Amino acid sequence: MTIEMIVSKERVMKKILSSLPAKLLLGIVVGIILGLIVPESVMTVLVPIKNILNQVISFVVPLIVIGFIAPSITKLGGNASKMLGIALVIAYTSSVLAAFMSMGAGYAIIPNLTFGEATELRELPADVFGLAIPQIMPVMSALAFSVMIGLAAVWTKAKVVTNLLQEFQNIVLELVNKIVIPILPIYIALTFSTLAYEGTITKQLPIFLIAVVIVIVGHYIWLAVLYITAGLYSGKSFMEVLKHYGPAYITAIGTMSSAATLSVALKCAQKSKVLRDDMVEFGVPLFANIHLCGSVLTETFFVMIVSKVLYGELPSVGTMLIFCILLGIFAVGAPGVPGGTVMASLGLIVGILGFDGAGTALMLAIFAIQDSFGTACNVTGDGALTLMLTGYAEKHNIEKQKISVDL
């Protein structure tokens, strides 16, 4: 009996250590250690490898979007247009309300905070290899294509196209399982090695540590609001969804991209017993591109901090209201790109808030410090919204589609 218990424990430990979350955590630790101790000559080798892996993952992202959203729309049949509209409404509502919550916290907390001047970062070695693998189309083009081709196939009852999309989904699944998942831990390790090397972790983080902690707490508060709301609306246990999202959360911390984390998020959502398979395949890829509550919440709080630090005052309430409402729309142009929310909304930051070059540079720097946690909030929040979709489908007697995908 004792031998059996020992063997059983060994199997459990082996399973845990070989799991994706364990590999990702190991990658983070190894990456930080490497970044702190290796010389520039080693980083000259690591930077190109990181960029190549990033190119590979980025190339697959539009394929994942097309491979899941388009077939899911065809499987929803006549209910596709309705479910798409509902998904858009709840995603934008979540992002904008998260921004409003962050704005309120900013007016209450920021006047009592004091920040020093930022420290310059160590420059990374140039990518001497410079390999570029352009995506077959931008992520937003893939999203638009998926929605249009899926709806058109439903409206015209195009059986050949529907079958073709299903075959394409199977192909994409193999790409994810055979290529993306295996290289993720390596990519995450290299990402954190570059962050540690340039000093983002050791120099910039202490300066804005209080602000970052406040924002992360805000993420958890908003996730609690989303999941409790989803549980009450659907009448199902939200913990049955949330408990499976650990790997997706960790992956998002490493990739800093909702779209790049999509494959892992799908695996997590598929494990939940309360989420409908058709809603998972439709909602999770869609929300990865349009639901950026964590990033929006973060950016709202940080623009207020930067305004206070550099310009001596907070933006007016009216200005911030306009900024929050528009930010939820502009952020949709940023999926799949680390730090993309800020990049996509630079026009708002400059045009509405009046930031100059120093303001935008500082904004980009401090946003990058917590970019991974904002992305993790985005991805985890998608599970709550998918639970809402499941609840809506069941309350309105939308027939469950037969979808069988091995994730």
Residues covered by each model-derived region:
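Transmembrane alpha-helix interface/packing and boundary motifs in multi-pass membrane proteins
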Residues: 247-256, 287-293, 325-338, 371
